[in-house]
Amino acid sequence: MGENMKVVEAMMAAWKKRDVEGFIATLADDIEYHWHPTKRPAVGKDKMRKFLSNYEAGFDQQEWRVVHSAEAGNVLFVEGMEVLVDRSTGVKMDNPFVQVFELRDGLITRMRDYYDTSQVHAPAKPDAAQAQSA
């Protein structure tokens, strides 16, 4: 296993425990995360904390695993599968994905996700979801 994959596995292990600060510790200060093609990227650690909070409010991620990976220099490609439950509908879904990571000095600087956006939508902000249910 390459060094880049070890960093990503540490990030995944932190998230599986819902250790937000452990997750954040694997990211560079200037992290740029493209999660959904219709949304602006999350840039910086504070935006990542906000993203993780919104993601957890929107989805119960029950599984997140790597199926294949390949490294080329500072770039890591990961093919995987996650099992999610949409908290707003209760619908459980298997979500195959590809993630591309760029790393510098042992930290993730860029993350891009590719998946079926017709199945997984961007979660509502927690305050917006509460306002709709009121």
Spans of features found by a protein language model:
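Short, low-complexity N-terminal intrinsically disordered segments enriched in polar/charged residues
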Residues: M1-T26, L107, K125-A134
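Short, surface-exposed coil-to-beta transition loops
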Residues: Q61-W64, E79, M93-Q99
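A short hydrophobic beta-strand element
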Residues: G73-E82
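Hydrophobic beta-strand positions in extracellular immunoglobulin-like domains
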Residues: E82-L84, L103
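Short beta-strand edge/turn micro-motifs at domain boundaries
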Residues: V100-A122
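A solvent-exposed, acidic/Ser-Thr-rich amphipathic alpha-helical stretch
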Residues: E21-N74
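Short, cysteine-centered beta-strand-loop-beta hairpins and adjacent loop/turn segments enriched
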Residues: L84-K92
